[in-house]
Amino acid sequence: MTTLRAFTCDDLFRFNNINLDPLTETYGIPFYLQYLAHWPEYFIVAEAPGGELMGYIMGKAEGSVAREEWHGHVTALSVAPEFRRLGLAAKLMELLEEISERKGGFFVDLFVRVSNQVAVNMYKQLGYSVYRTVIEYYSASNGEPDEDAYDMRKALSRDTEKKSIIPLPHPVRPEDIE
């Protein structure tokens, strides 16, 4: 049986198999530790019965309550290739959404590469919609051009009028994101 539990510092030494996917954004250890220190409830790992890490979600709470922009943000969601297509990503997203509801969020958002249609379709199946396109959000390597991202959102129960998911009519640049 899969165990969903809080991510711990020790997991930083055990999750490389998950991060090997070329579509997974990886960060330095201080970045992960910052999330672990500031938003531990938003950092969840899935562990197989034998102790192998299957996947994780890392997020945070951010935004302005006064402007109805307080929300949960998915910084990273990744599942090891051998554990995909089992509903694990959906379960991790559901947990982050529940935490965001309890924290009084208006919505949950995330950024995803426009080219990652598998992920885009999964998020749409989970109730997310494209709020805006962010031009050249992802930096490329090997001389490739930078890649655009979709900022996808799902309204939570506090956003009764679903204002947070009304799509913007034009793309934005990364520096225009608050």
Curated annotation (Swiss-Prot):
Enzyme Commission numbers on file: 2.3.1.254
Domain of life per record: Eukaryota
Keywords on record: Acyltransferase, Cytoplasm, Disease variant, Intellectual disability, Nucleus, Transferase
GO annotation terms (biological process): N-terminal peptidyl-aspartic acid acetylation; N-terminal peptidyl-glutamic acid acetylation; N-terminal peptidyl-glutamine acetylation; N-terminal protein amino acid acetylation; regulation of actin cytoskeleton organization
GO MF annotation list: protein N-terminal-methionine acetyltransferase activity; protein-N-terminal amino-acid acetyltransferase activity
GO CC annotation terms, alphabetical: cytoplasm; cytosol; NatB complex; nucleus
UniProt-listed InterPro entries: Acyl_CoA_acyltransferase (IPR016181), GNAT_dom (IPR000182), NatB_acetyltransferase_subunit (IPR051646)
Annotated catalysed reactions: N-terminal L-methionyl-L-asparaginyl-[protein] + acetyl-CoA = N-terminal N(alpha)-acetyl-L-methionyl-L-asparaginyl-[protein] + CoA + H(+); N-terminal L-methionyl-L-glutaminyl-[protein] + acetyl-CoA = N-terminal N(alpha)-acetyl-L-methionyl-L-glutaminyl-[protein] + CoA + H(+); N-terminal L-methionyl-L-aspartyl-[protein] + acetyl-CoA = N-terminal N(alpha)-acetyl-L-methionyl-L-aspartyl-[protein] + CoA + H(+); N-terminal L-methionyl-L-glutamyl-[protein] + acetyl-CoA = N-terminal N(alpha)-acetyl-L-methionyl-L-glutamyl-[protein] + CoA + H(+)
Impact reported for L4P: In MRT73; decreases interaction with NAA25; may reduce protein capacity to acetylate Met-Glu N-terminal peptides; does not affect protein stability
SUPFAM superfamilies with a match to the protein in the record: Acyl-CoA N-acyltransferases (Nat)
UniProt subcellular location: Cytoplasm; Nucleus
N-acetyltransferase domain location: 2-157
Related illness: Intellectual developmental disorder, autosomal recessive 73: A form of intellectual disability, a disorder characterized by significantly below average general intellectual functioning associated with impairments in adaptive behavior and manifested during the developmental period. MRT73 patients manifest global developmental delay with hypotonia and mildly delayed walking, impaired intellectual development with poor or absent speech, and mildly dysmorphic features.
Family the UniProt entry places it in: Belongs to the acetyltransferase family. ARD1 subfamily.
Self-association state and partner proteins as the record states: Component of the N-terminal acetyltransferase B (NatB) complex which is composed of NAA20 and NAA25.
Known role: Catalytic subunit of the NatB complex which catalyzes acetylation of the N-terminal methionine residues of peptides beginning with Met-Asp, Met-Glu, Met-Asn and Met-Gln. Proteins with cell cycle functions are overrepresented in the pool of NatB substrates. Required for maintaining the structure and function of actomyosin fibers and for proper cellular migration.
Record's protein name: N-alpha-acetyltransferase 20
Organism: Homo sapiens (Human)
Lineage: Eukaryota, Metazoa, Chordata, Craniata, Vertebrata
